[in-house]
């Protein structure tokens, strides 16, 4: 993938993150902490529903794309099993609509359930259609499909604010539904030829079984990973006030700016590394990429630590602790991104069943720490638990991949990852000593990165120059 295509794919995450950074303060000023906490529950619920109903077939689509001649048949074989499961679960859950709403949002309003269900359906179909654009390397279309729903969400919130519509959770839900519906329409238009061809293709039950054999282990792993990701939300929902969940949600939303890096890299990395493997390329390049990604992770953390105090000027007074929480909240997306490089051997060797045990251990670490820390420290306990669990997750994925595929030097990687976790926790504790303390810490860390990664930076610059040719 050349530089032009990389930039096309980068446009979506960058634009979406920029719009997200605008939307978060607007939501914080316009809606209560409790409603923002409920919006976080909605996001987590949609994620869980997708993980279950996808049956791992979205990953199977990516894995088999370059090895399959009949791509419409591949799309159909991956789409229909999950769609049937989604419809069955929707019918079963509809019987308990009010009870589910009470459990999720603290209010027994059946309307909340139905809107949540519509959000899940639109997100499910959009996920598969987005894979078409991703695998065809249609970066600009893929990016615009990410930016447009963010614009719709921001516009909907603006309408709520300026027209005097009641600023309550129902309005937030409808804004979220409008954004997911918009992206579905955009994806459907951009991939109309592909899904129409898939619709006309003949079903092949044997082929579907083959794909399920690859994806099925990822279902359990995915649900456990959802637990790893959502433990903070769940424990805050039941062990702390909704206001603490709202504080955590805003912090996580700002930290989601790191998802620019995660999203761009993930979109590019999976097709690239599988293409390398299929072409018999030198897979020693994976180690070089891992060091360059680690360098980027360190720089992102340092810059965020230096400038996180700016959140005080963007958010209401009740969110003043966000600047201390945000560094810990950055660790999960960054560790996941780094692990995508170091664990590539698991996917190449098709030993995906191992991911279940890796994720389970990290999930249990998160649960145990969250149960201990969240009741005492609220959002602060949640971000520390989450960050620690993701470091465990990263290290286990790396070690397993090294054992079953190719071994590579890891001491430097582990040293900097441990140092990053320690510094983020120190930043959280420095709230007693003022802003200048943690800013000074990260200012000292940045030159250290330059010293230890100067060779990797040079190699990365050379690679970028080469891609322009």
Regions found by a protein language model. Give the residues of each.
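Alpha-helical transmembrane segments of multi-pass membrane transport and lipid-handling proteins
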Residues: 79-105, 155, 159-162, 185, ...
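Membrane-interface helix-loop junctions in multi-pass transport and translocation proteins
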Residues: 28-36, 99, 136-144, 151-185, ...
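Signature of the first transmembrane helix
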Residues: 2-58, 86-94, 119, 154, ...
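Helix-loop junctions and terminal segments of transmembrane helices
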Residues: 24, 53-69, 135, 251-280, ...
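Membrane-interface junctions at transmembrane-helix termini in multi-pass inner-membrane proteins
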Residues: 3, 64-67, 122-145, 331-361, ...
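Interhelical loop/hinge segments that connect adjacent transmembrane helices in multipass membrane
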Residues: 2, 166-173, 185-229, 272-284, ...
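Hydrophobic transmembrane helix module of multi-pass membrane transport proteins
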Residues: 80-221
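Membrane-proximal transmembrane or re-entrant/amphipathic helices at the cytosolic face
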Residues: 427-469
């Amino acid at each position: 993938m050349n530089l032009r295509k990389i930039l096309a794919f980068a446009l979506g995450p960058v634009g979406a993150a920029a719009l997200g950074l605008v939307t978060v303060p607007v939501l914080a000023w316009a809606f209560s902490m409790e409603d923002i906490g409920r919006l976080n529950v909605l996001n987590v619920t949609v994620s869980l529903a997708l993980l279950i109903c996808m049956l791992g077939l979205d990953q199977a689509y990516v894995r088999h794309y370059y090895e399959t001649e009949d791509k419409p048949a591949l799309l159909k074989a991956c789409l229909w099993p999950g769609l049937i499961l989604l419809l069955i679960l929707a019918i079963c859950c509809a019987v308990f609509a009010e009870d589910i709403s009470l459990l999720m949002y603290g209010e027994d309003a059946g309307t909340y359930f139905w809107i949540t269900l519509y959000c899940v359906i639109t997100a499910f179909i959009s996920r598969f259609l987005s894979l078409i654009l991703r695998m065809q390397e249609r970066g600009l279309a893929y990016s615009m499909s990410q930016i447009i729903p963010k614009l719709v969400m921001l516009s909907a919130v603006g309408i709520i604010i300026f027209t005097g519509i009641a600023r309550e959770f129902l309005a937030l839900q409808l804004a979220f539904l409008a954004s997911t519906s918009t992206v579905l329409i955009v994806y459907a238009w951009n991939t109309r030829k592909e899904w129409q061809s898939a619709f006309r293709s003949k079903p092949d039950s044997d082929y579907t079984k083959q794909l399920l054999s690859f994806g099925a282990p990822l279902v359990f792993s995915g649900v456990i990973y959802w637990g790893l990701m959502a433990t903070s939300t769940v424990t805050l929902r039941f062990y702390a006030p909704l206001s603490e969940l709202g504080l955590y949600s805003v912090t996580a939303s700002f930290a989601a700016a790191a998802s620019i890096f995660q999203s761009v890299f993930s979109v590019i990395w999976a097709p690239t590394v599988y293409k390398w493997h299929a072409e018999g390329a030198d897979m020693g390049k994976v180690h070089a990429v891992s060091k360059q990604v680690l360098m980027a992770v360190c720089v992102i953390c340092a810059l965020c630590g230096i400038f996180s105090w700016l959140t005080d000027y963007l958010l209401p007074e009740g969110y003043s602790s966000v600047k201390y929480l945000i560094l810990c909240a950055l660790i999960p997306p960054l560790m996941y991104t780094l692990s995508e490089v170091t664990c590539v051997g698991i996917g190449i060797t098709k030993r995906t069943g191992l991911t279940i045990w890796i994720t389970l251990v990290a999930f249990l670490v998160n649960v145990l720490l969250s149960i201990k820390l969240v009741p005492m420290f609220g959002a602060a306990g949640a971000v520390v638990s989450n960050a620690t669990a993701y470091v465990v997750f990263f290290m286990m994925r790396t070690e397993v991949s090294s054992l079953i595929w190719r071994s590579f030097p890891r001491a430097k990687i582990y040293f900097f990852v441990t140092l990053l976790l320690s510094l983020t926790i120190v930043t959280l504790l420095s709230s007693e000593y003022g802003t200048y303390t943690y800013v000074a810490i990260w200012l000292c860390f940045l030159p250290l990165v330059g010293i230890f990664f100067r060779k990797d930076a040079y190699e990365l610059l050379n690679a970028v120059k080469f891609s322009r040719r």
